[in-house]
C-alpha cells in the first residue's frame, strides 16, 4: 500500500474538502501518497469549477486553469501534482492545441511549490475522436514530458483489449519504458 487515489479530476469547489481529507490522511498515513489527478487546459469552465463529471460549460481560459492549479497546490498541499492531457485527437497528424502550454503551467507552478509533477500518457483510443497512438506518438509524449521535468509517467490505457502477441499497441508503453530505462 503506497497511497490512495482520492479523486480524479476534481473541481475548484472540491479543494477545501480535499484539504481536510489530506490533513486526516497525513495524520494516519504519514508515509503514504494522497493522490488526486487533475484536469487539463481543455476542460470547460464548468468542469474546472465543479469537476470533470459535470460536463458542459464554455471553453475555459488559461487564467482560470492557472488559478485551478495554484489553488489546488496551495489548499491541498499535495506531495506531487498529477494531471492528464490527451493530445492525439482525430486523425494523424492532429494534436490537441494547448499541450505545451498546459505542461508549461504545471511545470512552472509545481517548481514554485517545490513538488514534482506526474502526467498521464495517452496510450489507447476511446470515444471515437481519440486515436490509438503509434509507438512514436507515445515516445513523443513521454519525452516531451520528461523534457519539461515530469518525475512520474503514467499510462492511460482505458480498456485496451487483451493481446499477448507483443505487437499490439498496448505493448508500446513497455517499449518506451525500456528505452527510457536504458538511458
Locate the predicted segments by residue.
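Glycan-processing catalytic domains of CAZymes
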Residues: 1-183
Amino acid at each position: 500500500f503506497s497511497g490512495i487515489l482520492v479523486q480524479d479530476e476534481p473541481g475548484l469547489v472540491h479543494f477545501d474538502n480535499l484539504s481536510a481529507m489530506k490533513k486526516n490522511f497525513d495524520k494516519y498515513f504519514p508515509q503514504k501518497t494522497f493522490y488526486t489527478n487533475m484536469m487539463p487546459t481543455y476542460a470547460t469552465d464548468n468542469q474546472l469549477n465543479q469537476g470533470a463529471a459535470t460536463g458542459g460549460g464554455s471553453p475555459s481560459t488559461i487564467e482560470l486553469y492557472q488559478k485551478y492549479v495554484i489553488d489546488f497546490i496551495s489548499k491541498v498541499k499535495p506531495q506531487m501534482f498529477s494531471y492528464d492531457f490527451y493530445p492525439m485527437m482525430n486523425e494523424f497528424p492532429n494534436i490537441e492545441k494547448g499541450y505545451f502550454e498546459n505542461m508549461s503551467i504545471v511545470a512552472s507552478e509545481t517548481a514554485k511549490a517545490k513538488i514534482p509533477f506526474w502526467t498521464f500518457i495517452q496510450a489507447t483510443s476511446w470515444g471515437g475522436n481519440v486515436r490509438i497512438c503509434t509507438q512514436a506518438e507515445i515516445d513523443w509524449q513521454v519525452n516531451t514530458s520528461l523534457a519539461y521535468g515530469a518525475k512520474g509517467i503514467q499510462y492511460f490505457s482505458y480498456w485496451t483489449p487483451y493481446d499477448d502477441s507483443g505487437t499490439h499497441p498496448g505493448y508500446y508503453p513497455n517499449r518506451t519504458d525500456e528505452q527510457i530505462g536504458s538511458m
